[in-house]
Amino acid sequence: MKIYIDGEWRDSSSGETIKKYNPSTGEVLDTFPAATRNDVDAAIDSAEDAFKRWSDMTSMERSKILYKALELISKDKDQLTDLLIKENGKVKREAMDETEGVIDQLQYYTEFERKLTGDIVEGTSNKRKIFQYKVPYGIVIAITPWNFPAAMVIRKLAPALLTGNTVILKPSSDTPLTAEWLVKKFVDAGIPKGVLNLITGKGSEIGDYIVEHKKVSLITMTGSTSTGQRIMEKASKNMAKLILELGGKAPFMVWKDANIERALKSLVWAKYLNVGQSCIAAERLYIHEDIYDEFMKKFIEVSKRIKLGDPESSDMGPLINKSAVETTEKYVDIARSSGYKILLGGKKPELSGKYKNGYFYEPTIIENVPQDSPLFQEEIFGPVIGAESVSSVDELYEKANDSKYGLASYLFTEDPELIFEASEKIRFGELYVNMPGPEASQGYHTGFRLTGQAGEGSKYGISEYLKLKNVYVDYSRGNLSISTVNDDLFKNL
């Protein structure tokens, strides 16, 4: 693959490349350029040159290009699905689902262009008005993760481009090929030179440089909390606007009156989707003591049936890389050494053929996990979940909220009073009641505490890419009177 700068596909200026591995087999899938600071400068200069032309276009004109990209992606959606399977390790049904999500998101944003409005506000007299315009920030750096490498690219690119910003896309080094595929569709759709640039490479080499660049106006990043904190530190030098979607530690709460089958299906989705590599993945399981044994028995049985291996026919894919496997093993080792009860899994599976070297890990269920354990306090990002019983709503709220993160949460109950009370008591940006995700395009994806700041999706997410500009107008005739200025100063001029 190549990077894309100033309307040209090119190699890194150093010629250096990095290997990309297939998570399912451990085999080399491709190589991609390791961009340099010179490449970053070239991309930023190109984006700066293109900004005036792009922002001067109407939102309708920009939307037409996005819509053409939507048509091209829809036409070749099977290619995207296959790429997600190979590069990310997704099983086929998950890859297909993400592809459809990409199409839905892009359609949502292309249809929003007629809703980009400002306000006219009354001034201090009847002949004064305040015109509040929404204008693009300028150059946007979009840093995207590997866990949903297509959906997250679109969730950042589409609103940024629609609102008149120019973009430099920096995808994860674990999924650069998906980003390249999507950028090609925008190029084929006729996006002008410099409006969209693609940079790949090591964050350690270009990460700090790109986010602290003086010409960058907005940075949007989905990733770890530690990375987000570093970006905040570096970007503060130039006061760049930040949209940061970071860590999560979702509580999955099942009350005594819950529909067990509905809760089980949703838990399988929330825990094992993408092998638990999701910021909204269920990582803490709280079940009412009256149904705890019944629920856990069924959850274990369902988890035993999950097939690993061939993405065409399996239920759960591999972790993204060797490091992710080691991290998962670290938390399971903590459980073992601490005496927690491992009810299922806790090891890598024994697979044969080309999948034997893949980064697979078995569904793992652990109980007797204390609230202060790393398994309940730190984001694991793997197919591991700790379980605990609760006896009261106060205990439920206290334990659910006991997290440094505050992104997604799940509640299963038939009690309307509990539903509405929990919607106020649970301090998370998203509460899914009697359903799994996924987040809808028209929903606002945001969180509390160390989950980040600002948000994405919906009309609120689009507004994050626009700066409110105020124009104060006095259209009265005659002399102007200002209370703090002496009119005598202007006599006989």
From Swiss-Prot:
Substrate binds at residues 147, 155, 279. Optimum pH is 6.6. Optimum temperature is 63 degrees Celsius. Pathway: Carbohydrate degradation; glycolysis. GO terms for molecular function: glyceraldehyde dehydrogenase (NADP+) activity; protein homodimerization activity; succinate-semialdehyde dehydrogenase (NAD+) activity. SUPFAM superfamilies: ALDH-like. The active site is at residues 245, 279. InterPro entries: Ald_DH/histidinol_DH, Ald_DH_C, Ald_DH_CS_GLU, Ald_DH_N, Aldehyde_DH_dom, Aldehyde_DH_Superfamily, NADP-Glyceraldehyde_DH. Stable for 2 hours at 60 degrees Celsius but activity is decreased to less than 50 percent within 15 minutes at 70 degrees Celsius. It is an enzyme of class 1 (oxidoreductase). NADP(+) binds at residues 144-147, 155, 170-174, 202-208, 223-246, 279, 379-381. The record marks 147 as: Transition state stabilizer. It comes from the Archaea. It catalyses: D-glyceraldehyde + NADP(+) + H2O = (R)-glycerate + NADPH + 2 H(+). Keywords: NADP, Oxidoreductase. It holds the Pfam family Aldedh. Its EC number is 1.2.1.89. GO terms for biological process: Entner-Doudoroff pathway through 6-phosphogluconate; gamma-aminobutyric acid catabolic process; glycolytic process; protein homotetramerization. Homotetramer. Dimer of dimers. Belongs to the aldehyde dehydrogenase family. Glyceraldehyde dehydrogenase subfamily. NADP-dependent dehydrogenase of the nED (non-phosphorylated Entner-Doudoroff) pathway with highest activity towards glyceraldehydes (e.g. D,L-glyceraldehyde and D-glyceraldehyde), to a lesser extent towards D,L-glyceraldehyde-3-phosphate and glycolaldehyde, but no activity towards aliphatic or aromatic aldehydes. This is D-glyceraldehyde dehydrogenase (NADP(+)).
